[in-house]
């Protein structure tokens, strides 16, 4: 089994550098505990890269990523760069090109409510008692966001805006197999999201998903219209295990599912290419208002590193250990400000203290 890995580390803007520092501590501990090695190359991205190199994704950063087994990404953006043209701002100028260059067609967004944090959710306790763990599998490079033609035509009050929604058999089959593989390793339940009652692309989507399901007889497949799925996520989220979504539907539902957990600071994500390459990042933003104050929640960045261990390095045992260490810290009452409720048994801790606690749990496990 491979024991050495090359990682491109892109801390970015806002809280990115400080939460990334905690993820680096955790990877140090993984090296020690599991006898592996991570060669880490740090590179600029986002606003930090604009300030230094003139663009959000410098060529040097791309080269470092191309020479790596995976990318661990922090966060980008902030009001400092909001006056730039939209395509030059940190978010669009860095993330979209990275997805295109590396063929990142699949987005995995876990939405996890840990048993110790059910009170932080916006849902009633009886709806989420014991917590839940949902994985949203979103197709990332097709659908209405990318298909052509699109644009605005005409003048004055007669203008017309238009977009095209399109999927091919191959695009749907590729993402469907990722979702079935994930479901097979989890609760063996897959819900495919579409709008097949009105959209031709969804008719194709459903037909392909049904065809692929024959290769996964151990996974229970069901279909759900996207409007019903949005309602069911709020009404009874524990019914779901893996959700398979086209691009736009996954964009919306993954954010909805994420907010049910109480804080974006808890949630990781992975964007995967074919093979083992992927980019891993927190689901939240750069939070420039709290940057540098040592109060940001590093858990999403740490869990993103755990996803990197699982999907790009094949180190499932290490990933499990990191995730369990995080769960143990939360069960012990440790809370950063975003999830602190001043309840009995809770202890307010800093960014660095939370990282140190996860490392301590990991080492002793």
Swiss-Prot record:
SMART domains found in the cross-reference section: Iso_dh (SM01329)
Top-rank EC class of the record's enzyme: oxidoreductase
Binding, substrate: 99, 109, 138, 227
UniProt catalytic activity: (2R,3S)-3-isopropylmalate + NAD(+) = 4-methyl-2-oxopentanoate + CO2 + NADH
Site feature Important for catalysis, where: 145, 195
Pathway assigned to this chain's UniProt record: Amino-acid biosynthesis; L-leucine biosynthesis; L-leucine from 3-methyl-2-oxobutanoate: step 3/4
Subcellular location: Cytoplasm
Sorted UniProt keywords: Amino-acid biosynthesis, Branched-chain amino acid biosynthesis, Cytoplasm, Leucine biosynthesis, Magnesium, Manganese, Metal-binding, NAD, Oxidoreductase
Cofactor binding notes: Binds 1 Mg(2+) or Mn(2+) ion per subunit.
Annotated SUPFAM superfamilies: Isocitrate/Isopropylmalate dehydrogenase-like
GO molecular function, one term: NAD binding
GO cellular component: cytosol
This enzyme's EC code(s): 1.1.1.85
CC cofactor: Mg(2+); Mn(2+)
Binding site for Mg(2+): 227, 251, 255
Family to which this protein belongs: Belongs to the isocitrate and isopropylmalate dehydrogenases family. LeuB type 1 subfamily.
NCBIfam families assigned: leuB
Name assigned to this protein: 3-isopropylmalate dehydrogenase
Source organism of this protein record: Syntrophotalea carbinolica (strain DSM 2380 / NBRC 103641 / GraBd1)
